[in-house]
Amino acid sequence: IVGINYKGTSSELKGCINDANNMYSLITNKFGFEDVKLLLEQDATTDNIKENLRWLVSGCRPGDTLLFHYSGHGSQIADTSDPDNEPDKLDEIICPIDLDWKEKVITDDYLKWVFDTVRAGVNLTVFLDSCHSGGALDQANQYQVVVATKGVDLPVSGGRYMAPPPDVQARI
Protein backbone atom coordinates (compact mmCIF):
# COMPACT_ATOMS: atom_id res chain seq x y z
CA ILE A 1 0.00 0.00 0.00
CA VAL A 2 1.47 3.33 -1.09
CA GLY A 3 0.29 6.82 -0.14
CA ILE A 4 2.06 10.03 -1.12
CA ASN A 5 0.85 13.58 -0.43
CA TYR A 6 4.05 15.27 -1.74
CA LYS A 7 3.96 17.53 1.35
CA GLY A 8 5.64 20.89 0.89
CA THR A 9 5.68 20.74 -2.91
CA SER A 10 3.68 22.75 -5.44
CA SER A 11 1.88 19.50 -6.33
CA GLU A 12 0.83 18.65 -2.77
CA LEU A 13 -2.18 16.39 -2.36
CA LYS A 14 -4.28 16.23 0.78
CA GLY A 15 -5.79 12.76 1.12
CA CYS A 16 -3.43 10.11 -0.23
CA ILE A 17 -1.80 9.17 3.07
CA ASN A 18 -5.23 9.06 4.68
CA ASP A 19 -6.48 6.80 1.87
CA ALA A 20 -3.50 4.47 2.28
CA ASN A 21 -3.95 4.28 6.06
CA ASN A 22 -7.67 3.57 5.62
CA MET A 23 -6.92 0.80 3.10
CA TYR A 24 -4.35 -0.68 5.48
CA SER A 25 -6.87 -0.65 8.33
CA LEU A 26 -9.58 -2.16 6.14
CA ILE A 27 -7.57 -5.07 4.80
CA THR A 28 -5.82 -5.91 8.08
CA ASN A 29 -8.73 -5.43 10.52
CA LYS A 30 -11.73 -6.44 8.40
CA PHE A 31 -10.26 -8.87 5.87
CA GLY A 32 -7.44 -10.35 7.93
CA PHE A 33 -4.50 -9.65 5.62
CA GLU A 34 -1.30 -10.21 7.61
CA ASP A 35 1.67 -9.62 5.29
CA VAL A 36 1.07 -5.98 4.43
CA LYS A 37 3.68 -3.34 3.62
CA LEU A 38 2.79 0.33 3.99
CA LEU A 39 4.91 2.97 2.22
CA LEU A 40 4.00 6.55 3.10
CA GLU A 41 5.47 9.83 1.84
CA GLN A 42 9.29 9.74 2.16
CA ASP A 43 9.36 5.91 2.27
CA ALA A 44 7.58 5.72 -1.10
CA THR A 45 10.72 6.01 -3.23
CA THR A 46 11.12 4.43 -6.65
CA ASP A 47 13.42 1.73 -5.29
CA ASN A 48 11.18 0.95 -2.29
CA ILE A 49 8.03 0.71 -4.39
CA LYS A 50 9.73 -1.52 -6.98
CA GLU A 51 11.26 -3.72 -4.28
CA ASN A 52 7.91 -4.13 -2.56
CA LEU A 53 6.11 -4.87 -5.83
CA ARG A 54 8.60 -7.69 -6.48
CA TRP A 55 8.14 -8.88 -2.88
CA LEU A 56 4.35 -8.88 -3.34
CA VAL A 57 4.39 -11.27 -6.29
CA SER A 58 7.34 -13.44 -5.27
CA GLY A 59 6.41 -16.87 -4.06
CA CYS A 60 2.69 -16.47 -4.66
CA ARG A 61 0.77 -19.69 -5.21
CA PRO A 62 -2.63 -20.56 -6.65
CA GLY A 63 -5.29 -19.58 -4.13
CA ASP A 64 -3.31 -16.60 -2.80
CA THR A 65 -4.87 -13.14 -2.77
CA LEU A 66 -2.61 -10.16 -3.49
CA LEU A 67 -3.42 -6.47 -3.32
CA PHE A 68 -1.52 -3.41 -4.53
CA HIS A 69 -2.94 0.01 -3.67
CA TYR A 70 -1.38 3.27 -4.88
CA SER A 71 -2.70 6.71 -3.97
CA GLY A 72 -0.68 9.61 -5.35
CA HIS A 73 0.13 11.41 -8.56
CA GLY A 74 0.10 9.70 -11.93
CA SER A 75 1.28 11.17 -15.19
CA GLN A 76 2.72 10.29 -18.59
CA ILE A 77 6.18 10.29 -20.15
CA ALA A 78 7.43 9.60 -23.65
CA ASP A 79 7.69 5.84 -24.27
CA THR A 80 11.37 5.45 -25.07
CA SER A 81 11.61 1.67 -24.65
CA ASP A 82 9.02 0.63 -27.25
CA PRO A 83 7.00 3.57 -28.60
CA ASP A 84 5.01 1.33 -30.93
CA ASN A 85 3.37 -0.57 -28.04
CA GLU A 86 1.34 2.52 -27.08
CA PRO A 87 -1.00 4.20 -29.58
CA ASP A 88 -0.16 7.63 -28.14
CA LYS A 89 3.54 6.74 -27.73
CA LEU A 90 3.30 7.65 -24.03
CA ASP A 91 3.86 5.52 -20.95
CA GLU A 92 1.57 6.05 -17.99
CA ILE A 93 3.49 6.33 -14.73
CA ILE A 94 2.90 6.41 -11.02
CA CYS A 95 4.94 9.16 -9.38
CA PRO A 96 7.14 8.09 -6.47
CA ILE A 97 8.32 10.71 -3.98
CA ASP A 98 11.74 10.87 -5.67
CA LEU A 99 10.37 11.23 -9.21
CA ASP A 100 12.92 12.71 -11.63
CA TRP A 101 11.03 12.07 -14.92
CA LYS A 102 13.92 9.98 -16.28
CA GLU A 103 15.19 7.10 -14.15
CA LYS A 104 13.14 7.52 -10.96
CA VAL A 105 9.80 6.58 -12.51
CA ILE A 106 7.53 3.55 -12.40
CA THR A 107 5.99 2.99 -15.81
CA ASP A 108 3.01 0.96 -16.93
CA ASP A 109 5.54 -1.31 -18.65
CA TYR A 110 7.20 -2.02 -15.30
CA LEU A 111 3.85 -2.73 -13.63
CA LYS A 112 2.94 -5.09 -16.46
CA TRP A 113 6.31 -6.85 -16.18
CA VAL A 114 5.83 -7.40 -12.43
CA PHE A 115 2.17 -8.40 -12.61
CA ASP A 116 2.75 -10.75 -15.55
CA THR A 117 4.80 -12.93 -13.17
CA VAL A 118 1.69 -13.70 -11.13
CA ARG A 119 0.78 -17.34 -11.63
CA ALA A 120 -2.60 -18.62 -12.75
CA GLY A 121 -4.98 -19.10 -9.84
CA VAL A 122 -3.67 -16.11 -7.87
CA ASN A 123 -6.15 -13.29 -7.26
CA LEU A 124 -4.39 -9.95 -7.81
CA THR A 125 -6.30 -6.74 -7.15
CA VAL A 126 -4.72 -3.41 -8.10
CA PHE A 127 -6.06 -0.02 -7.01
CA LEU A 128 -4.47 2.96 -8.74
CA ASP A 129 -5.92 6.16 -7.32
CA SER A 130 -4.13 8.63 -9.57
CA CYS A 131 -4.36 10.54 -12.81
CA HIS A 132 -3.84 8.38 -15.92
CA SER A 133 -4.57 5.23 -13.92
CA GLY A 134 -7.01 3.96 -16.54
CA GLY A 135 -4.16 3.37 -18.97
CA ALA A 136 -1.63 2.07 -16.46
CA LEU A 137 -2.61 -1.55 -17.03
CA ASP A 138 -3.84 -1.18 -20.60
CA GLN A 139 -1.52 -3.86 -21.92
CA ALA A 140 -2.78 -6.49 -19.52
CA ASN A 141 -3.37 -9.68 -21.43
CA GLN A 142 -3.61 -12.40 -18.85
CA TYR A 143 -5.88 -10.75 -16.32
CA GLN A 144 -9.16 -8.90 -16.28
CA VAL A 145 -8.88 -5.14 -16.03
CA VAL A 146 -11.83 -3.24 -14.60
CA VAL A 147 -11.50 0.52 -14.82
CA ALA A 148 -13.61 2.75 -12.63
CA THR A 149 -12.85 6.42 -12.87
CA LYS A 150 -14.23 9.44 -11.11
CA GLY A 151 -12.68 12.84 -11.03
CA VAL A 152 -12.40 16.21 -12.63
CA ASP A 153 -10.41 17.39 -15.62
CA LEU A 154 -7.58 19.64 -14.49
CA PRO A 155 -5.49 22.03 -16.56
CA VAL A 156 -1.99 21.00 -17.61
CA SER A 157 -0.42 23.28 -15.00
CA GLY A 158 -1.51 24.68 -11.68
CA GLY A 159 -3.70 23.24 -8.99
CA ARG A 160 -2.69 19.87 -7.65
CA TYR A 161 -1.91 18.36 -11.02
CA MET A 162 1.67 17.15 -11.54
CA ALA A 163 2.56 18.46 -14.96
CA PRO A 164 4.46 16.02 -17.17
CA PRO A 165 7.73 16.92 -18.88
CA PRO A 166 7.56 19.47 -21.75
CA ASP A 167 7.84 16.83 -24.50
CA VAL A 168 4.69 15.17 -23.18
CA GLN A 169 2.88 18.45 -22.43
CA ALA A 170 3.24 19.39 -26.09
CA ARG A 171 1.13 16.34 -27.02
CA ILE A 172 -1.70 16.99 -24.58
Region roles according to the model:
Residues 1, 38, 126-128:
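Structural beta-sheet core signal
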Residues 1-9, 71:
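Cell-envelope and extracellular/periplasmic
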Residues 7-21, 25:
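Glycine- and acidic-residue-enriched helix-capping/strand-helix junction motifs
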Residues 22-35:
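Signal peptide-proximal N-terminal region
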Residues 37-46:
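Short beta->alpha junction loops
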Residues 46-71, 75-142, 154-159, 163-164:
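Caspase-like (clan CD) cysteine peptidase catalytic core
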Residues 133, 169-171:
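Intrinsic-disorder/coil detector with helix-boundary
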